Amino acid sequence: MRHTLTAQVLAKALKNLYPNVKLAIGPIIENGFYYDFELDKSITIQDLPMIEKEMKKIISSGNEIEKKYISKEKAADLFKNKNETYKVDIIERSEQQGNFSTYYQKNTDFVDLCYGPHLPSLKHIGPFKLTKVAGAYWKGDSKNKMLQRIYGTAWKNQDDLKKYLNMLEEAEKRDHRALGKQLDLFHLSLIHI
């Protein structure tokens, strides 16, 4: 639940910082979450501290979370009015007719689709870290538009977060691609035969 809610806060932070962003999906994954989005500015790893700062500001509000179930038609209209084309696509392609789960941060205009359970308020989010940026095709299809993706993780306490980040750092050091470069094991020839 912590990862789900933190992904929603990331989406809200992106909306605050970049009002023209179009949100796609923000599922949880093992030990974290990601959020895909379309934005005319390329987000880099250097942008993550600013985004984290905005997320902390949102979390500090302690806003309560409200989950509402609405019909397919109402859900499509809601996201059309917000110009959220990816959300509309998800809704329109769904065979589901009713009970679309929507997530609201009270005292804000932010709303998103969300299927998972939620903590009751933002004050329950623990320490988090945005970890990397990447690209991803909409619906995993290279014929579709390339979106941007931000990965993150959230933990119950600072010690658990620190342990996880240390584990990631150690795994990165052992990555065969990095080791190959460091040990000069791979060579590319520029000579064409």
PLM segments and residue spans:
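Active/ligand-binding-proximal structured segments within catalytic/core domains
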Residues: 1-17
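Auxiliary tRNA-acceptor-end handling modules of aminoacyl-tRNA synthetases
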Residues: 13, 22-28, 34-191
